[in-house]
Structures are given as C-alpha cells and as structure tokens.
Amino acid sequence: MNYYMNNGSSNAEENNKELNNEIKAVYESLEKRKDGTTRQTISNAIIVLENDPEFKGAIKRNELSCQTDIVKKMDWRRRSKSFTDTDFNNILLRMEKRYGITRDKNVKRAVDIVSNNNHYHPIIEKLEGLEWDGVVRVRHLLPKYLGTEESDYIY
C-alpha cells in the first residue's frame, strides 16, 4: 500500500504542488518492504524529521534548559516552545498519514536523536547576534571597580 498516494495529503497540501513534491521525494527515499509498505525503523523516522518540509529544522535540543524544543511555527496549536505530548502526537499523526510510519517508540527515539544533533543555546545565539560598538570597556573594569592601577598587566 502506498501511504503517500492514498493517505498522505490534506486538501491544503493538494493545492500546493511544490510541497507535495517535497513530501513525495521524502516518501520515496524511505526504506520499504517487498510489499511496498514503509519499514518501521528509527532511520526512516529520522529521514522524515530531517527532510519533511514541515519538520526540517523544527526540532532542537535547548542546551540551557536541557529539553527538546520546537523552534518553527507548526500547523497545530502550541502554547510554548517546549516539546509536549501533543506535539509528539501531531508528529506521529502526520508521519502515519504521509509516510505510513506508525511505530511510536521509534518516532520517539528519532525525535531524541534529531533534537540532540540539532542543539542550540538561546543565550549564546543572542550574544553571537550582537555587534560590538567599538568602545573598549574591559580595559578600565578592574581600575574602576576594584581600585587597581591601570597597566598592561591587568588589561
């Protein structure tokens, strides 16, 4: 049974040919059984999470909170960035409809692997996004606040 062709598209997706082509390409890249059904493997679930246009780049591990976050806007109602059971159930539903992947244990493991490979730290990202204004401040920090003499040794 070809899950993509029979179950894979909602009406909105059918109107979007490019999205359908991307989903079809992901479906065709999955490992199949002799009867044409999708194999229920962790590696297939990882392929979907890393390549499906909806999931690609969405699942990341937050190194500050040590939790999995969804950092993209998704098609279902969400209350926070933190990964919830509702998020998992929606991902599983889409994997089942589009790709025939139904084994929730393997999808859970794939989410963990993908989020670990795509980690981020929100504070570091914020700091790396800032530009220095060119004003030297550190050189005068110790003399100003600790009363040390200004010299090249404490710069």
Predicted stretch roles:
Residues 134-145:
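Long, mid-chain structured domain cores
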Residues 143-155:
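Conserved NTP-binding/hydrolysis core of motor NTPases
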Residues 1-136, 150-153:
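N-terminal nucleic-acid engagement/recognition segments and initiation subdomains in replication
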